[in-house]
């Protein structure tokens, strides 16, 4: 039986899992969850994720939530299919993948997601973005990208010379970020820009990106 992924493909966190599924050439069923109708707050969904956020994944008797936990599971279960996203055959390489995945989760994502929330989500809720929050997180993001610029001057991808979860996890929020007037934070750093353009050229991304349809209503 194919895995069932519950969510809306416009969600960055759902897209993160979709990218992984496509990279691993894994059969799955996407079960739509209407976020605008708050279907992620219904009891049927809360039984899968008590925090009421997409995505959730069901694989036989296993239910998972949190996108990075889901991608780790998919990458491990299907380690011999598709792209090797974890470098599991070499403990040192695998450790570097985990290291840069932690950087994404604890440094990059908090900054970029805060910007996206203010510029895309808040206006959709009929409110005005908080300029101070945007500015503070753009400053933090710039410092993080300076570290990336140096790193990507040494390796093609964050965890080495092959594409892994450490790169994949960045893609959806960065895609939305590049739709804003602040895309220069990426484009003005040659190594980061080249890395991003490489990520955008992957077949899995080309399958997922049409679903990322939310656009900024303010800059």
From Swiss-Prot:
EC nos: 2.5.1.18
Classification via InterPro entries: Glutathione-S-Trfase_C-like (IPR010987), Glutathione-S-Trfase_C_sf (IPR036282), Glutathione_S-Trfase_N (IPR004045), GST_C (IPR004046), GST_Phi_C (IPR034347), Thioredoxin-like_sf (IPR036249)
Domain GST N-terminal: 2-82
Top-level taxon: Eukaryota
Keywords: Cytoplasm, Detoxification, Transferase
Annotated ranges, domain GST C-terminal: 90-217
Localization of this protein: Cytoplasm, Cytosol
Pfam families noted in UniProt: GST_C (PF00043), GST_N (PF02798)
Binding site for glutathione: 11-12, 40-41, 53-54, 66-67
PANTHER family, sorted: GLUTATHIONE S-TRANSFERASE F13, GLUTATHIONE S-TRANSFERASE RHO
Protein name (Swiss-Prot/TrEMBL): Glutathione S-transferase F13
Organism of this sequence: Arabidopsis thaliana
Gene behind this protein: GSTF13
